[in-house]
From Swiss-Prot:
Keywords: Cytoplasm, Queuosine biosynthesis, S-adenosyl-L-methionine, Transferase. SUPFAM superfamilies: QueA-like. Belongs to the QueA family. The gene is queA. Transmembrane segments: none annotated. This is S-adenosylmethionine:tRNA ribosyltransferase-isomerase. GO terms for biological process: queuosine biosynthetic process; tRNA wobble guanine modification. Its main location: cytoplasm. The keyword Transferase applies. It is found in: Cytoplasm. HAMAP family: QueA. GO terms for molecular function: S-adenosylmethionine:tRNA ribosyltransferase-isomerase activity.
Amino acid sequence: MKVSEFDYELPSELIAQEPVEPRDASRLMVLHRKTQRIEHRIFREIIEYLEPGDLLVLNVSKVIPARLYARKKTGASIEILLIERLEEGIWKCLVRPGQKVKKGTELVIDEDLSAVCLGRGEDGTRILKFQPQDDRLIFEKGRTPLPPYIKNEVPLERYQTVYAKEEGSVAAPTAGLHFTPELIEKLKKKGVQFAEVVLHVGIGTFRPVKVEEVEKHKMHEEFYQVTKETIKKLRETRERGNRIVAVGTTTVRTLETIARLPEQEEYVGKTDLFIYPPFEFKLVDALITNFHLPRSTLLMLVAAFAGKDFVMEAYREAVKRRYRFFSFGDAMLIL
């Protein structure tokens, strides 16, 4: 399958530069897979589509302030993006410009914080040891790691879901940005159940698909965790005959990863599961997601879930109706 089949025309003014206030006032496109019908609603009206006993599964990973600005002793500016914590104060990072950072290169963030390059990781990353080795201090100095298509500085809390609690992502699981505490409360009152997973969104989010053939693309590994409590809720939902509703593509990848493993009480590991058409979904019955970049692995996942032709038609409709796209954009519910 060609990557070009997942391309579409998007006017740049439809790329949302800041989030909507309140969060649940964003638009919601509803896709009905059985009837191929499309509806246009507001996100807070999602409550009308969820039944008592349905299980909403949230990714509670929290975005870290992963972007840092440093200087070499020569005065050259270096941008650092924290990718993965190896141990306290030692991180796998992306650095720009990369050719200027070699083993032994010292980087100064400010008078309180510096780093030294211990060497190269795979895939062009660098291993940086910070001085002092204090993650709290590193986070204090860091900024929100916004995607390159967002030009405004946005406070970290607005690039964070209201339920985020497990630090580790370098990009937000954006489908969850539309939920407010009030909406969650209303859903609970209706009898909708909630469960949590963790998938720390990694650098794959920033990396474009560079191959021509979809099947040749390789995903980066990302850390995930599913607790006993969540496993129990998934099982009970299945037994009741209710739906498992994934909030976001990261939740889908976590659930479909464990669905392919031997049964365990709880799961923790790394996944590089790449979902593209055709794909047999074993756990996810419905999906809440944003509008994704052309040719992206996220769009391929959505196409696998709802059918490529239907999804590409929905995207053309979204452009025509001037929906807002990407991280701070509008949402889609696929039933």
